[in-house]
Amino acid sequence: MSFVPTKVFFTKGVGRHKEYLSSFELALRDAKIEKCNLVTVSSIFPPKCERISVEEGIKLLTPGQITFAVMARNSTNEYNRLMAASIGVAIPADDTQYGYLSEHHPFGEDEEQSGEYAEDLAATMLATTLGIEFDPNKDWDEREGIYKMSGKIINSYNITQSAEGENGLWTTVISCAVLLP
């Protein structure tokens, strides 16, 4: 049986609770995907896959449904510890080719830093598969320009959730690309 997703939506959430597992559940609720049995998959953005809104995507979910997702997840119970969970996205100009989704789950990075890093990861993975020449030592802004000017990468972006740990509680952050039939 072959299953290639035709739709994707991006969501994120944060949860806090005295129990680790419950903080994850609350992050799933915040992201509006708690009713699914999530199966994490690796990082390919399928050819011809349409991005839809969270609201549209939620309507397509059924409680208990086996749902595939690329998920970045991070947790801490340390007071004031900054963490993030980011999904980076890179989409080729040719929609018959696949793109990339990257996961990044750091400590000590805010949303902007983490998101930019995840986006860079996805775009660099795509650039290397497309044969785009670039200097890996250049900063992201320079490489982003090279990638997009090549005409082979049409878009890159990220979805990121960050939070700081609260005293006495587990804090969990998630970012997900939810893949649908």
Curated annotation (Swiss-Prot):
The record marks S42, S43 as: Cleavage (non-hydrolytic). SUPFAM superfamilies: Pyruvoyl-dependent histidine and arginine decarboxylases. GO terms for molecular function: arginine decarboxylase activity. Keywords: Decarboxylase, Lyase, Pyruvate. Its cofactor is pyruvate. It is an enzyme of class 4 (lyase). It comes from the Bacteria. It catalyses: L-arginine + H(+) = agmatine + CO2. Disulfide bonds: none annotated. Binds 1 pyruvoyl group covalently per subunit. Its EC number is 4.1.1.19. Signal peptide: none annotated. The keyword Transmembrane helix does not apply. The keyword Protease does not apply. The modification Pyruvic acid (Ser) is found at S43. GO terms for biological process: arginine catabolic process. This is Probable pyruvoyl-dependent arginine decarboxylase. It comes from Chlorobium phaeovibrioides (strain DSM 265 / 1930).
